[in-house]
C-alpha cells in the first residue's frame, strides 16, 4: 500500500492514473497482484481493474477493445445458482442481438468496492476468496468504483463501440429509476 502511495509523491492524483500494476520476480513471490489491483481502486488511483480467469491483472483496453461486453454486478458472496442462471440466460439473449458477433463477447463479473466493504473496511481474504471462486468457474473479474450504472457503461464505451449489456435483477432495475440517483 505504501509503495502504491509513493508512486504519487509530488503528483496530483488527477494528473496521473495508474490503472494496472504487476509485480514479478523473486522479491515479490508473496505478493498477490490482485490485492495490488484492489488497492489501486480503493485508493482512488483508478476507477476499475480487470483480472482474467487465471488471476492475472490485465489492462482494460487489452480485454475490452472492440468487444461486445456483457456484465453482471453483484457481491458474489458466494456466487449463486441464480447468478449463474442470470448470466447464462442473459448471454443467450445477448448473442441473439442482430449487431452482436457471438464469437466476440467479453463477459465480466463486476464487484464494486462498496460491495466488497460490507460492514466496514475491505477484508482482503474475503476479496481473494470471491475472486478465486469466480476465476475457478472461468470468469473475468472487474473491480470498480462505479456505483452508478451509467458510469460503468461510460467506462466500457472508452474501450469499444460494439454492443454492451448489463444484467440486473428486477429490484435493481426498479432502483435505477429512483429519483435520488439523479
Q: Can you name each region flagged by the protein language model?
A:
Residues 1-182:
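Nucleotidyltransferase catalytic core that binds NTPs
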Amino acid at each position: 500500500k505504501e509503495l502504491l502511495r509513493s508512486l504519487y509523491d509530488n503528483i496530483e492524483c488527477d494528473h496521473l492514473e495508474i490503472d494496472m500494476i504487476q509485480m514479478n520476480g523473486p522479491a515479490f513471490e508473496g505478493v498477490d497482484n490482485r490485492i495490488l489491483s484492489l488497492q489501486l481502486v480503493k485508493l482512488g488511483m483508478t476507477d476499475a481493474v480487470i483480472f482474467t480467469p487465471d488471476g492475472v491483472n490485465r489492462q482494460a483496453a487489452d480485454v475490452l477493445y472492440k468487444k461486445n461486453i456483457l456484465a453482471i454486478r453483484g457481491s458474489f458472496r458466494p456466487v449463486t445458482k441464480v447468478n449463474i442462471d442470470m448470466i447464462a440466460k442473459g448471454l443467450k439473449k445477448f448473442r441473439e442481438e442482430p449487431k452482436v458477433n457471438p464469437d466476440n463477447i467479453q463477459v465480466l463479473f463486476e464487484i464494486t468496492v462498496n460491495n466488497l466493504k460490507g460492514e466496514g473496511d475491505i477484508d482482503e481474504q474475503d476479496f481473494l476468496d470471491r475472486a478465486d471462486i469466480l476465476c475457478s468457474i472461468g470468469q473475468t473479474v472487474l473491480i470498480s468504483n462505479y456505483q452508478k450504472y451509467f458510469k460503468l457503461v461510460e467506462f466500457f464505451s472508452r474501450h469499444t463501440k460494439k454492443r454492451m449489456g448489463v444484467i440486473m435483477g428486477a429490484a435493481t432495475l426498479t432502483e435505477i429509476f429512483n429519483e435520488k440517483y439523479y
